[in-house]
Amino acid sequence: MNNHVSVLEISGNAIEHNLQYFKNKLHQKTKILAVVKAFGYGSDANKVAYFLKDKVDYFAVAYAHEGISLRKAKITTPVLVLHPQIQNFDEIIKNQLEPSIYNLKTLNAFITHAKEKEIKSYPIHLKFNTGLNRLGFSKVNIPEIMEIICSSNYVKIKSIFSHLAASEDNNERPFTLNQLQNFKEI
C-alpha cells in the first residue's frame, strides 16, 4: 500500500496574480518571458503555457524537445530554447523555435546550418556571462560576434540576455549590481 501520494495543485488565479504583480513592477513596454522548462518544473509545461499563452510574450525551455511539445500543444507564442544542440537545429527551425547562442562554435554552426537550408534572418538570442560563469559569451567576444553576424544575412539578433547569479541574496547585492553593470556595458 502506497501512503506517500503527493499531489500538486496549480492555481490559475495565483499564476495570473503573480504575473500581474511582476508586470506592475516593470515598464509598460517590457516583454515577459515565462520559463516552462523541465516539464514546467513538475507542473506540466503544456498546461501552464496554454494558460499563459495570451498573457506573456515569450516562453523559454531548456531543450528543443520541450519546445516541440509546446508546438504540438498548439502554443504559437515564440519559444526560446536555452540549450540548443547542434544536432537539433533542423527541429528548432522546423518548429519555429528560437535558439539561445552562447558561444562562437554554436553561432558559427547555426549560421552554417541556416545557410545550407537557405534561411535568411532567423531570430537568435545571444547570452552573455556576467557572473554566473556557466554559459555565455564574454565582453571580449563582442567584436568577433559582430563581425560574424554583420557579414551574414542568415541570422538576426532578437535579444541579448544574461542569467544573474545570486540576485535573490541580499548579502550578494554588490555582486548583483556588478553583474548588472557588466550587462549594461555589453
Positions of predicted regions on the chain:
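Active-site-proximal beta-alpha core segment in soluble small-molecule metabolic enzymes
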Residues: 2, 7-10, 14, 30-182
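Alpha-helical packing segments of well-folded alpha/beta enzyme cores
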Residues: 15-18, 22, 186
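Conserved PLP-enzyme active-site core in the AAT-like
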Residues: 25
